[in-house]
Amino acid sequence: MTTPSPSDRVEIDVEVNGRRRTVAVDARETLADHLRNDQKLTGIKLGCEHGVCGACTILMDGAAVRSCLTLAAQGDGRSIRTVEDLSDGALSPLQEAFKRHHALQCGFCTAGFLMSATELLEANPSPTKEEVIEALSGNLCRCTGYQTIVEAVLDAPGQIGNKNG
């Protein structure tokens, strides 16, 4: 593997979890690798690295995207949220709903599901079961069978935006 030359680096101005920063990134580096390795945001998981499993899902300007398929340079001028942004020390209402419904087992896929669910609930605070299933259809889980994940997302809407309850 060859080491990138300085000319292969691109300076970007990006907001990550509410904090704006200017950083130099390898022009070929994925956003997932940049966030995990340079920003130390390891909630992002790399599963398939082909955009199929959803474990690397983040929100970019409010839309769920696969960070393994997105170049870090594409983050220039954008607002990015990762699973680390969902709570401020205590579990978020959505995370509490996942806990209440036992919507995770090994946990590898959980961050991706949480980010996809966050996109849905911020756009549609009272989704139907069918809308939840559709919103989560790009995320794979080998452990739960999905039912408890759907139940958790359906249970969370009344609590979104209310960290106390």
UniProtKB/Swiss-Prot annotation:
Gene transcribed to yield this protein: ndhS
Activity modulation: Nicotine dehydrogenase activity is inhibited by tungsten.
Subunit annotation: Heterotrimer composed of a large subunit (NdhL), a medium subunit (NdhM) and a small subunit (NdhS).
Main function: Component of the nicotine 6-hydroxylase, which is involved in the degradation of nicotine. Catalyzes the hydroxylation of the pyridine ring at C6 to form 6-hydroxynicotine. Can use both L-nicotine and D-nicotine.
Protein's recorded name: Nicotine 6-hydroxylase small subunit
Listed GO biological process terms: alkaloid metabolic process; nicotine catabolic process
Keyword Iron found: yes
Organism of derivation: Paenarthrobacter nicotinovorans (Arthrobacter nicotinovorans)
CDD domains xrefs: fer2 (cd00207)
Assigned GO CC terms: cytoplasm
Cofactor binding note from Swiss-Prot or TrEMBL: Binds 1 2Fe-2S cluster.
Location relative to the cell: Cytoplasm
Gene Ontology molecular-function annotations: 2 iron, 2 sulfur cluster binding; metal ion binding; nicotine dehydrogenase activity
Conditions for induction: Expression requires the presence of nicotine and molybdenum.
